[in-house]
């Protein structure tokens, strides 16, 4: 590693005799990882932890995850990502790099970003995956935090997520929010809501029939958020959610992940041991 980061995590997973093990766990700076053994299916389950409680102005973080052939791992954040104010105008950054080999399966369930007053934040995620691999990837952003509890007091938020299959760019999604320049409540932005989340699922098992069945499944739930599902040009889908609370949005995300787990892989529902989980 040539660049110096304020926090760095590298996780690697391999299949050994039909069982996934963590063959690499590296952590430095403000970043830590913690294992949890609560998954009933025996899937390695890790929390990403920031020891400082949040990201300080100008800090840079890196998360690298490698999932080898036939391995399955679950990675989530312990808490939302708090981005503190940037009084000097410096950009705070986090980069995530994910590699998925043949028939591997990663569930990356990140909590939303909560930008503080005057904060500036840029997040990039690059996923390189084999066409036979399976991916569940979620993230989000809120209206932020300020002492006066006023929404959208941050200066700059940018989130770029790109997925490559066999070195070809197949999905690119960018969220750019500059509340001082944009009306965050109008159509196409938050539309009166305070929380936005997205979920991307890519798998050779996802087709139009699966997408329609998932849509019907979600419509049968008592949900308080607005959501929409779209099929991708590849075998996959993207779910976008606007809601009053992050907890309401996460309920939809977990429901989608559970549906995929059960219908495609025959696994039990997620148990992320989060305080807002409502089963």
Swiss-Prot record:
The keyword Cytoplasm applies. Pfam families: UreD. Keywords: Chaperone, Cytoplasm, Nickel insertion. It is found in: Cytoplasm. One of its GO terms (cellular component) is cytoplasm. The keyword ATP-binding does not apply. Its main location: cytoplasm. One of its GO terms (molecular function) is nickel cation binding. It comes from the Bacteria. Belongs to the UreD family. UreD, UreF and UreG form a complex that acts as a GTP-hydrolysis-dependent molecular chaperone, activating the urease apoprotein by helping to assemble the nickel containing metallocenter of UreC. The UreE protein probably delivers the nickel. Required for maturation of urease via the functional incorporation of the urease nickel metallocenter. This is Urease accessory protein UreD. The gene is ureD.
